[in-house]
């Protein structure tokens, strides 16, 4: 029999998939608590009206370890634009002080190549033009990004990257994204 009204016959995501997306947002250290709540609300909107009531852990967003850097999403957009345009960028690289706030550490001028999600952190893989070295810097420590007019140094011109980026090596040989060569140590 036909009932009057309308209904959605197909959904883009199943509820289990939406729960996985929500868990990813919750566990993401690089998304602020406020942004996490907003994203989770929008993800819940992709299902029916009963889905939100089945998600109990939404209200625990503030209990998770989250960044305070609200500029992260702007940083991601800006860096992607610079990578697409193949231009250098300048930014302030910061470190957390004992007051748990970011403090400017240095100004960087880099050729950006890739953003890498590793150990629940976003890193910028870039060639530091002043140090003449590849760097991996946490996106939540970057502020005040500015585009330059200079073209990015092609990655194939950098020693060790003539064949491009080896993601397998990066993820296994550099667990904390330090670029120094690995050294063997002996415990006695």
Q: Language-model segments: which ranges?
A:
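Loop-centered beta-sheet repeat module
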Residues: 80-135
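Bulky hydrophobic/aromatic content
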Residues: 7-97
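Surface-exposed, charged, gly/pro-rich loop-and-adjacent secondary-structure segments at domain edges
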Residues: 125-188
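Short, well-ordered alpha-helical segments in soluble proteins
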Residues: 47, 83, 119, 143-149
């Amino acid at each position: 029999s036909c009932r009057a009204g309308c209904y959605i016959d197909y959904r883009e995501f199943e509820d289990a998939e939406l729960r996985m997306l929500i868990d990813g947002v919750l566990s993401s250290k690089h998304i602020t608590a406020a942004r996490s709540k907003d994203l989770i609300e929008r993800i819940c909107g992709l299902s029916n009206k009963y889905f939100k009531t089945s998600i109990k852990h939404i209200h625990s967003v503030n209990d998770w370890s989250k960044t305070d850097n609200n500029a992260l999403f702007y940083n991601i957009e800006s860096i992607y634009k610079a990578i697409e345009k193949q231009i250098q960028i300048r930014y302030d690289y910061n470190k957390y002080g004992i007051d748990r706030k970011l403090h400017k550490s240095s100004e960087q001028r880099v050729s950006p190549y890739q953003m890498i999600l590793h150990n629940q952190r976003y890193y910028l893989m870039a060639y530091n033009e002043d140090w003449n070295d590849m760097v991996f810097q946490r996106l939540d420590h970057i502020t005040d990004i500015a585009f330059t007019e200079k073209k990015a140094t092609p990655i194939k011109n950098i020693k060790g990257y003539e064949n491009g980026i080896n993601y397998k090596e990066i993820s296994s040989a550099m667990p904390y994204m330090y670029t120094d060569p690995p050294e063997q140590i002996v415990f006695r």
